[in-house]
Every structure is written in C-alpha cells, then in structure tokens.
C-alpha cells in the first residue's frame, strides 16, 4: 500500500480549505483517508495560522514510508527543514511555448526580417543617387586639373 501525505479539499465554492491527510495513493482526492495531520487555509494572509501541521505525526508517517506531495513537502520543509528535503521539481516542457505561440513568433520574425530588408533597400536606394552625383561632380574637377596641367 503506497501512502501519500497530501491535501484533501473542503470548503465552499471559491473559498477553499484543505486538510493535510495521510491516504492511500489510490484513493480519491477528497475521499477516504487514514489520518488527518494538519490543515491549510489559503484564504488567510501568509502567517503561522495559514498552514498548521502536527510535525510529530508527519515525522512518524514519513518514517513509515509515506511520501508527501510537492505542495505538502514544501509546507513541511518551510516549517521544519530537517523533516523533509524539498527540491523544486524540474519540468523543462512547462517553460516551452505552445504551438500558437511558436507560430506567432515565427510570423513576427518573418515580418521583422522583411522590414529590415526593406530598410536596407531604402538605404541602398538613397545612397545610390548620392553616389551617382558625387562622381559627376568630381569628374569636372578632374577635367579641370587635367586642363591646368596641359596649360602649363
């Protein structure tokens, strides 16, 4: 029999209240449990009354092989760090964007590339007439210099 220390929801709609219970992992979330070892009221401000745990019972159940869920393990670690070593779970897929977000990012990147290409073309077009005019002005100066050499 696999034991879990987990939350069992109670309270009214939009007003949650949780019992921290030891239960068989196969039993329903709010169903039958073996023992109630604490409570969690998320409606209270963050203070000592928000999470109440009987740490002696918690340690006894952990010694018997019960494993806390992530949330309850975090509560246990916050109250008494020696009782349970809580580590943040690593889920790299959670941070990965969804299909629509990937498509939107690809469209945005494509539009950005088109916009940059258009800017480059505009700069090149603006520089080309200036480049054509500049050699035309230099050419008469070069001709004038050549004429001066001939006249000498």
UniProtKB/Swiss-Prot annotation:
Keywords: Ribonucleoprotein, Ribosomal protein
InterPro entries in the record: Ribosomal_bS16 (IPR000307), Ribosomal_bS16_CS (IPR020592), Ribosomal_bS16_dom_sf (IPR023803)
Biased composition (Basic and acidic residues): 97-123
Region Disordered, annotated ranges: 84-152
BP GO terms, sorted: translation
Residue spans of biased composition, Low complexity class: 124-144
Residue stretches spanning the membrane: none
The keyword Ribonucleoprotein belongs to this UniProt entry's keyword annotation: yes
Signal peptide from the UniProt entry: none
Any Pfam family hit: Ribosomal_S16
GO molecular-function terms, A-Z: structural constituent of ribosome
GO cellular component: cytoplasm; small ribosomal subunit
Family: Belongs to the bacterial ribosomal protein bS16 family.
The name this protein goes by in its record: Small ribosomal subunit protein bS16
Organism (species): Maricaulis maris (strain MCS10)
